[in-house]
Amino acid sequence: MNHRTWMSLLSLGAFVAQGAAWAQTAGAMQQKVTGPQARYWLGAETASGMAMPGMGGGGTAETGGGLGAMAGMMGALMSGGGVGAPRKSLRLELGGVRTGNPSEARHTVPTALAMGESLSLLGPEKGTPAAERPERDVPEPPDGKAKGRMLFFWGCGERAGPGQPVVLDFEKLSQGVLPPDMRSNINLRAFRQGPAMGRDAGYADWPNRKNSKTVPSQASLVGDHLVQGNFVPDIRFAVGGAHDFMEALSLKQAKATSGAQQLQWNRVPTALGHFATAMGFKQGAGDSADIVFWNASSTKLLGGEQLMGYLPPAETERLVKARVLLSADTTQCAIPAEAVAAAGGGMTWINLNAFGPELNVVHPPRPEDPKVTWEQQYAVKMRLRSYTGMLGDMENLSAQRSNKADEPASRTEEKKEPSPTDQVKNALKGLFGR
């Protein structure tokens, strides 16, 4: 064996040995993680305008879907602020690896929250079944009788982009025919779910069947927090100004000469991105109707109701770069004239969501030595958003209602069952809103 061959073998041996050493080091660097024993999720929302309680957010079936936000709306009315006045809401969800039978906890809050010394979390009554969360999918018209269409538009601008609208015909749908262009051009990621009854051995939340308070308009989350319960270790965390309630959105609209519907809103300092949606109706001939959906994504996205809740900051950043979400600095957008015309001259309902930061606390902190097991006692996640809603072109909506009211009385009386048009609307329940 010559010298060159020996050198090649030595080099190969050194490479293999180095690779084995790297693999051994990588294996040694893999830190073992256990827990957490408890997870605590907080949802802090600021609503304004005609935003619906629990719209795409933290409301759950266990509490009637947005009990805190509803209390906030009622509080605004009672204080004379009106439905459009900014209102805050909280949703607290605590899960543990053991149960308290029943599970109970107390969240000692900062004085700045102005809600007393503490909030009482309560688990479900014994024997209460876990709430089912129905999947949202393209609805099937009842008995194939529904007549009408769903029209999908997307993107800001006075004119609709190419390939719009995507049309879903209910009569064709009843025959099993879907349009070939129903697929969106962006995948929205699924994220780890928070604490919930049936998902955690022990579970308690607030507001609940016994405890519910209106969150005052001046409430602040800033300060030290302590959570103590009969099924979890003590949980301590602090909230700074960067993770306080977000400022309220103020949404305005105007009709452009092109026929587009101009939207404009204020800049919320802690917002990381925005998403807007709109919906409209247009009565067709006979019992048919068109339901029009629009969203602000520059990338083809049908519907988009799933973006009217919370998002992790990393996902917000990804979707801003993908031009699905509007940037934090964007404060205006136009609903294309074609979408407005398809809705009979004006959108009926408009929603705007501002995604905020997220506070994550894990105790104890990760050990610097990777050989030491990271035994997590608890993990806290606080999510923030600000959202608003408004009625669109009221004159157009009133005109359509007036035309419907002008139908002959005899024809109206003949219809003892819901009309096919109403069946289309009923089939939409749970698709792009609650």
List where the protein language model places each region.
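Bacterial N-terminal signal peptides
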Residues: 8-18
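Short, aromatic- and glycine-rich surface loops/edge beta-strands on solvent-exposed regions
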Residues: 211-235, 345-359
